[in-house]
Curated annotation (Swiss-Prot):
Main location: membrane
InterPro entries associated with the record: TM140 (IPR028038)
Pfam families listed in its UniProt record: TM140
Cellular localization per UniProt: Membrane
Ranges of the Cytoplasmic topological domain: 1-13, 106-114, 167-185
Extracellular side: 35-84, 136-145
Cellular component terms per the entry's GO annotation: membrane
Source taxon at top rank: Eukaryota
Membrane topology: Multi-pass membrane protein
Segments traversing the membrane: 14-34, 85-105, 115-135, 146-166
Claim: Transmembrane helix is one of the keywords in the record: yes
Keyword list, A-Z: Membrane, Transmembrane, Transmembrane helix
Classification of source organism: Eukaryota, Metazoa, Chordata, Craniata, Vertebrata
Protein name (database record): Transmembrane protein 140
Originating gene: Tmem140
Length: 185
């Protein structure tokens, strides 16, 4: 009985959406801030959104490259900047999703709900675009076995963002229901 009341009042889907949102945020914080965006972090290779270090045999250590050298290696400055903007912009927009969702749930305001949907859609597009753009530039130095836990975390966050977008569209806030339904007869 209590379970059906929670479902009918739209509380259970809302709690599920908020839990999934917290999980997506944790995964993005882990990959982009804790792991510093490094998709490959090995003793002989470090490739991330802000690090590009390859092993130099003659030096016997990692040599990190910046933009004049990165252009020679085939990584354009504008492309890398757009990839960074995409993934870190997705994190920033996702941070702002819970507040409009909370306000939409408790005020039953459709405008705030639409704002949360727009933030989720933009975050999903930015994360997918930034990650695919970055991987297209650095894939010739990466192998599947080189990848660390940051890439699966970002891919799982992308899946959660898509699922959140679908769930948020599927379960919009409902209008306030009258407590006394006998008066409507």
């Amino acid at each position: 009985m209590a379970f059906s009341r929670l479902w009918r009042n739209n509380h259970l889907p809302f709690v599920g959406i908020m839990i999934l949102l917290a999980a997506a945020l944790c995964l993005m914080f882990y990959a982009l801030l804790w792991k510093a965006g490094n998709l490959a972090d090995l003793p002989s290779l470090r490739i991330g959104f802000y690090n590009f270090c390859l092993w130099k045999e003659d030096m016997g250590s990692l040599a990190c490259y910046n933009f004049p050298e990165l252009d020679v290696l085939g990584i354009p400055q504008v492309g890398l900047a757009l990839a960074r903007l995409g993934v870190y912009g997705a994190l920033v927009l996702t941070v702002f999703v819970p507040l409009p969702l909370l306000l939409a749930q408790y005020n039953r305001d459709e405008g705030e709900w639409r704002l949360a949907v727009c933030f989720l859609a933009a975050s999903s597009i930015l994360l997918a675009g930034g990650l695919s753009l970055f991987l297209s530039f650095v894939w010739k130095w990466l192998r599947l076995s080189f990848l660390g836990p940051a890439l699966p975390a970002l891919c799982l966050a992308q899946l959660l963002l898509i699922f959140l977008l679908v769930a948020t569209v599927r379960f919009p806030p409902r209008d306030k229901e009258d407590k006394n339904q006998w008066e409507n007869c």
